[in-house]
Design a protein with these regions (language model features):
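Conserved SAM-binding loop
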Residues: 60-64, 69-176, 203
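Short alpha-helix
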Residues: 197-214, 220
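Acceptor-substrate binding/catalytic loop of class I
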Residues: 168, 188-205
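Conserved alpha-helix/loop element of class I SAM-dependent methyltransferases that forms part
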Residues: 40-67
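N-terminal, positively charged/glycine-rich alpha-helical extensions of SAM-dependent methyltransferases
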Residues: 8-35
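Conserved hydrophobic residues forming the short capping helix/wall of the S-adenosyl-L-methionine
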Residues: 53, 57, 109, 210
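Alpha-helical membrane-targeting segments
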Residues: 172-194
């Protein structure tokens, strides 16, 4: 893990969650491993993000449509979204609180000759002066310690007129059955304990937090 001692950092970084994902770090790029569901889901996520960004910024170019877009991928893991965003032309900065995840992601991107700025940090601690056109918070808010403070910190990094994506698991009986009972206990796609249902969020709760941080909620999907 990153050597972070600042007290405010601990209000978003959940050590238990970081240790959990650090143990699985070597499997990020194994399409048949513990992150198989993410690999299957990834093409949909990439297409969704790309199309939303193109529409939001009224981009006309078909070739590398995200060229010169400053993008921040928060909780990047092994870089499963960072790399495709880079290939689409975005200038990618990707952060994760697990040093092991950052090492795996950096190694993989260098192997594929992709220029991605990987940093082991969190949104409230990131030592960077610029702001971003696009911020990705994909399947991360259910793993942080203080969602209000986390999203407030993310908002400070977003340019005026920028767009932030927040994806998480809805707090429903269906999500408990599929994401925890099914994926962890029956199919064994994910290690038991990967998700905690208490940390799942209902859309209205997430919208409330975002509005509190002066974000305009454009669309809720899923």
């Amino acid at each position: 893990n990153c050597n972070i001692n600042n007290q405010s950092i601990m209000s978003t970084i959940n050590k238990k969650e970081i240790e959990k994902f650090s143990k699985m770090a070597d499997e990020w790029w194994d399409t048949e491993g513990k992150f198989k569901p993410l690999h299957k889901f990834n093409p949909l996520r990439i297409s969704y993000i790309k199309n939303k960004v193109i529409n939001h910024f009224n981009i006309k170019s078909k070739f590398m449509p995200l060229k010169n877009i400053e993008l921040l991928d928060i909780g990047c893991g092994g870089g499963l979204l960072s790399e495709p965003m880079c290939r689409l032309g975005a200038k990618v900065t990707a952060i994760d609180a697990s040093q092991k995840n950052i090492d795996v992601a950096s190694f993989h991107s260098k192997k594929n000759k992709l220029n991605i700025n990987y940093l082991c940090t969190s949104p409230e601690k990131i030592n960077i002066k610029k702001k971003f056109d696009v911020i990705l918070n994909m399947e991360i808010v259910e793993h942080v310690e203080d969602i209000d403070f986390f999203l407030k910190s993310c908002t400070k990094l977003l340019k005026k007129g920028g767009i932030m994506f927040v994806a998480t698991l809805n707090k429903t009986l269906k999500s408990y059955v599929f994401a925890i009972v099914g994926a962890e206990y029956i199919l064994r796609w994910l290690p038991i304990g990967t998700h905690e249902w208490e940390k799942f969020l209902k859309p209205e709760d997430l919208i409330s937090i975002q509005k509190k941080n002066k974000l305009i909620v454009e669309k809720v999907d899923g």
